[in-house]
Amino acid sequence: MKIAVTADPHLNNNSYHIQDSDSGLYIKSIDAIRAFEWFGDEAINRKVDRIVVVGDVYHHPDTTELIRTRLNKVLQKLAGEGIQVVIMAGNHDFCSRYHALQSLVGWNKHIKILDKPFVETGVATYVPHTMDIECERTDFREVIKGLPTADSKNHVFFGHFAVRGALRDNLSREESGNAVSATDIEGTGATVAFLGHFHKYQRIKGNIPIFYTGSIENHRMDDMDGKRGFFIYDTDTGEYERVDYENCRPMHSIEVEDFDSAMLILRDGDWESSIVRLSAVGEHSDYLDIRNKMMELKRLFSAAGGAYIFCRDKTAAVDPKGSKIEIESIEKINVLETLKAEIDERIPDDEECSLTKDLLEEVHAEEKSK
């Protein structure tokens, strides 16, 4: 049996909060659903017998009807070709004891929704993000150790959780002592494992091949350097292959010293459909200058076909030579910096943290101009 494996589609991804004027969807949602539609077509073209989605079909459980409709069209197309579909619940699919995949349960005989561990004798072990883990904080290691050991020659393991040593989405390493280890997965008797949860395509060190398949479409800036695609695994031969996706939206992170260097870079680049993050690394006064002139940068960027551009502060907190800061009252500076520090504490996701601070800066600038 040939199985096509993907993970973390996040079909209603709202990163950057940029809406398409025609559909009203966020553009990263459009990117995600297009990638999933491509995955479905590739599964059909490569004549697989089954697809497995290893969690996080959605970015959050409250999604739009348009996203559901496009997902259903992919599932109908696969069912029409006689391809089985197994969808595992991920942590982003859940809201307490409810998960957004429940509307698909019983929808078609070709589709199976898994929200609790399941061992398919002679084929595979599935460990989704479960209701118990969502509501009762059951340990994944306990769940895995309680599963029956596989006895088939080419037994595949699918799981949606963190594994020790894996690269997280923020590029740090998963070092938690409670995280599942490669040894835990090997103890199930599996001969290969495909995982979801972290979005980077990576192989975990161990005695069997253990992969995070990675999401097909980039989710955020930190994803952009990695390869994108999905796996095909043959349970008869134990062989697997990687199929690459070449149509990710361009995303660029660029360091700039000041406004003039930002203008120069934007004039010379190809920004068609791109999302660009400028990181101000000069003096803090230069960052403030960029922020004050951001509309000029946005007009230039938009004229070049760009989708979205924003700037983050990577300068020192205070510029002793910057007249703009010295003009401000110390109370206002302290309030702004205090709020930014609070945002750093409360929002663990780097990209969301940066965007929230950017919004705070914009609101602060607007209030000052009144």
What label would you give each PLM region?
Residues 50, 61-211, 215-218:
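His/Asp/Glu-rich metal-coordinating catalytic cores
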Residues 38-46, 74-77, 146, 265:
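A generic secondary-structure signal
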Residues 43-47, 149-153, 269-271:
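Glycine-rich phosphate-binding loop signature in dinucleotide/nucleotide-binding domains
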Residues 1-69, 350, 354, 370:
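N-terminal active-site segment of His-dependent metallophosphoesterases
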Residues 235-370:
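Accessory, non-catalytic peripheral segments of nucleic-acid enzymes
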Residues 192, 196-259:
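A conserved active-site cap/scaffold subdomain adjacent to cofactor or substrate pockets
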Residues 58, 132-134, 283-288:
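Short acidic, S/G/P-rich loop/turn micro-motifs used as interaction or catalytic elements
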